[in-house]
Amino acid sequence: QAVIDGANEAGGFCFLAHPFERGSRVGPDLDPIEWESWDVEGYAGLEIWNYMSEFKGLLRGKLWALFYAHYPGMGIRGPYHATLEKWDELLAQGKRVAAVGGADAHGKTYSMGPLSRQVFPYTHLFRCVNTHLLTEKPLNGNRGHDKALIYDALREGRTWVGYDGAAPTKGFRFRARSVANEA
């Protein structure tokens, strides 16, 4: 709570990252790092999908690790249901909780015997789970102007999460209508 309060007091904001995570017995650095303090307040949002958290959960053994290190798309399925259920629960309580998704990119190289592989290169990870922002005005290249628009969009929850691993989501549009043509 102190970190969230400090960030807010300094004009920043916080997101709860990888709230639910499965670890892997393949290595100690693959233990789950889940969010536990659900009684905190004042955070801006929740990371509803973390690519590397999902990848880590696929690694049930060394053979699985070798396979998914080369073919991650064969196992990546989407946000954990527990995360989406928690987000729904928080929203049902009347809390404003923005959604973000992330790559959790570290570009670390892992070795297993004579084999080594970077899991995963930044160029791969930044084409996977991405947070898209809906800004009130177009970005114009001015750092101060653009920073304010980006921070406002994040803080206010004008975001959506796309999986660019399947197909590019840039420019994607969606609409919702009710019987009365309201959304």
Where do the protein language model's features map onto the residues?
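Domain-core and long-helix interface of multi-subunit machines
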Residues: 2-121, 137
